[in-house]
Amino acid sequence: STIICTAVLITAAVRGNIMFNTVLELLKSRNYKAIREIFMDMNEADVAALLQQFYDDHEVEKYELPLLFRLLNKDVAADVFAYMDSDTQMMLINAFTDKELQEIVDDLYLDDTVDIIEEMPANVVARIIKSADAETRKQINQILKYPKDSAGSIMTTEYVYLHRSYTAKEALDWIRHVGMVKETVNTLYVTENRKLVGVLSLLDIVTADDNDKIEDIMEDNVISVDTLEDKEYVASMFSKYDFLSLPVVDRENRMVGIVTFDDAMDVIEEETTEDFSKMAAVAPSDDSYFKTSVFTHAKNRIAWLLILMLSATLTGAIVNKYQSAFAAVPVLVSFLSMLSGTGGNCGSQTS
């Protein structure tokens, strides 16, 4: 399976390089129509990865990235933007006009906007906030007030709620009316005076009779999390219950938002990376490993390297001096593997 995964990654990398070179040649010849057609046939995540290559390639002029981004269909531009890393996003924001930035912010999902804001310097944040409408600014500020590692900090307020008195037909009409601007319509939440009272899926409504009441087909035993719940625990709930989204409530059981599956996966990836860093005795970093300077990597490891080098030197001296003791008391040999492990620790720190 490892060989298969490696082969898939290599194939993807080769395809990515071929696409990069193709678009680069079209860009040099100013064949913008052909580039647009290529973008239209690609998934948003693949387009973002391609544009990321242009940002990372030092031989490509930086002004060409905003030019390529402007060739995207406006319907997918915000989705592509959300997939990019924070450095590329900041570069594009600085290149955007106020009107262009407003269009992107209007089309972004709220949780993506908050994620971007959390990675940006104050002057860029000010531009983003200024570009948002009053209601979006209010929702952004609501999410930003929650602690960094809480459920509230990773939730979105863009969910579909229903009244228990709706019929299935009325519910479908409501979903059609508001669904396009919501994060998801797969899971629907029933509220009464803002309090969460039930949950059901879109499939439940589609397969029900038109006159069936929502309160008759909803599930009233709803699993939810508090706004201040640790986000790592929230992510574990998705693994346990196979949720696509999870409702977030305040202390009075009033529904304030949902955490979606993609945000839970981001948390799991972040926590896994942090755990691996701790296993190697390296301070976890929010920055990309490959974009962190050699000096920063060295600074994070130098203290442990010095300690391990000194302990390895001391261990070697002790072993050489007391070789006769090892011969006289063989049980001491069992400690050699532990002592020699410092060499492996040095290797993991250096790599």
PLM features: residue spans?
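Hydrophobic packing positions in regular secondary-structure scaffolds
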Residues: R15-A283
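Alpha-helical transmembrane segments and their membrane-interface boundaries
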Residues: T272-S351
